[in-house]
Amino acid sequence: RISIARAFLKDAPIIILDEPTSALDVCVKAQVINLLQDLQDEMGLSILFISHKLNVLRSLADKITVMYRGRVVEEAPTEQIFANPIHPYTKSLLEAIPKLDPSLRKRRTFIDDSFIQSNIPKYSLNDVNFVSTNDSQIGFVEIDNNHFVEAEVV
């Protein structure tokens, strides 16, 4: 918490936080998130919050960008990510969030590169706005208003 407060003393327009709530108990984690929300509202501060726990980001972020192996694979407003995840890695991150209701729990499976590659979404150029390409077949496409995903363009 002291490191976070120290960053705000410099009056920076943006603060970058890398897993600031990891290894914190639930009460302290909630206090840190509440502090960040208050300071964000009061100072109009932009926060780049790096985390693999999407449930932590849900209450804090306006937009979520999901990266896998150094590549952006999905980006959308927070509620779109939670309501309609498209990329298999985004889906796996959301499935990793613990569920209180036993009927909603799924048996977790390990995903690897071959699973990701074989489950990349496929879209026709006629159905989406093509944004950019990494190679000849994989591109970054807009599938909905401000919802972008890495996909195979066919």
What are these regions (language model features)?
Residues 9-13:
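A short, proline-enriched helix->beta-strand linker immediately N-terminal to the Walker B motif
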Residues 78-154:
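Short catalytic/signature loops enriched in Gly
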Residues 72-76:
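ABC ATPase "signature
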Residues 44-50:
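Conserved H-loop
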Residues 15-19:
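Catalytic Walker B motif of ABC-type/P-loop ATPase nucleotide-binding domains
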Residues 30-43, 55:
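Helical segment within the ABC ATPase nucleotide-binding domain
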